[in-house]
């Protein structure tokens, strides 16, 4: 339990930031899931359209330190590679 007023304020602040980050992480995962579902169905056009939404979502999450920038780049790269394989 926080004792000082500054510690209590920090606890409130952390709770607010956690809620915001959780929301952003959920949105990011949803956009990635949409791409993966399109890839699984074999629909290249839908996958490309979903990827156009997922890539900025991943990069924004990395920029805001929700995920590591290398993890976001790796995810984008792997999704793009899987979409490219659909065309072959």
UniProtKB/Swiss-Prot annotation:
Residues 1-36 are annotated as: Disordered. GO terms for biological process: translation. InterPro entries: Ribosomal_bS20, Ribosomal_bS20_sf. Pfam families: Ribosomal_S20p. GO terms for cellular component: cytosol; small ribosomal subunit. GO terms for molecular function: small ribosomal subunit rRNA binding; structural constituent of ribosome. Keywords: Ribonucleoprotein, Ribosomal protein, RNA-binding, rRNA-binding. Binds directly to 16S ribosomal RNA. Belongs to the bacterial ribosomal protein bS20 family. NCBIfam families: S20. This is Small ribosomal subunit protein bS20. The lineage of its organism: Bacteria, Pseudomonadati, Pseudomonadota, Alphaproteobacteria, Hyphomicrobiales. The gene is rpsT.
